[in-house]
């Protein structure tokens, strides 16, 4: 395990992402039953390879991911010692309100679903949904998060979203101890590398989510035609095919290389991988331990798309 930046939280290099457990077929293309979701969380808690669970108020209808996690936790008498759970505050799903008042209510809903009286890590989720001025206004989301921390309802604060420059703006406030972004440090996209390196050097915890680029690097572009939950570019798909072919020649699943690309980065504390079943938990642990020839890394790097195709191209 490694300390998550300067938080004092000790986490495993793998973190379980739980948005698939909310059963969102429109996003993932499949259903996950409540029973299956609870079994998946149980599989994580029963093992010793992963001690870190990531969720959010907004995962699924009426917070179904948190509710299902809460069922698993209650079945074990609460959050087991040594397990770190992070959740995120989200706007009101009906009105879109993302005020300070809503941030407080979001956490209250999460704590009720999870059966907890506090969380170890609380993220401001996808702040790109409002302006930076709104996010940092007096009485707004950031100020309210700081109040929740002072009140002991959240031990540590993070910011989790997409656009790297916006994440940098929020880190520069000095309130957030952890940063999470998704799909921006993968075999196909390096948008977040500078953000991650800078944050790591400042003692900020770095979480890299969606190392498979929304599934393309795990399933292949034929089965998963979208990159990063919606974007499709033929050049990116062609690069994924070339990478898969290179990995196949080396006798390695491309998914293993995609996952370990993040795990081997010295400036990433933990990599968030979505799981939908106990089998996927076991598969993820196995992929993390797969031996990869050194020569494959250089070949994969040579096949990566250029910066103009990244989600956040540099200026």
What are these regions (language model features)?
Residues 1-83:
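N-terminal binding-site loop/beta-alpha segment at the start of enzyme catalytic domains
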Residues 4, 16, 53, 69, ...:
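Conserved, mostly hydrophobic/aromatic
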Residues 9-14, 48-51, 79-83, 116-120, ...:
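Short, well-ordered coil/turn segments that N-cap beta-strands
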Residues 30-44, 98-113, 163-169:
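Short, acidic/polar
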Residues 56-66, 92-97, 130-133, 185-191:
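Acidic-and-aromatic substrate-binding clefts and catalytic sites of carbohydrate-active enzymes
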Residues 70-81, 111-116, 170-174, 198:
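Acidic (Asp/Glu)-rich catalytic clusters
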Residues 111-131:
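Active-site groove signature of glycoside hydrolases
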Residues 127-315:
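Beta/alpha (TIM)-barrel catalytic core signal, keyed to glycine-rich beta->alpha loops juxtaposed to Asp/Glu
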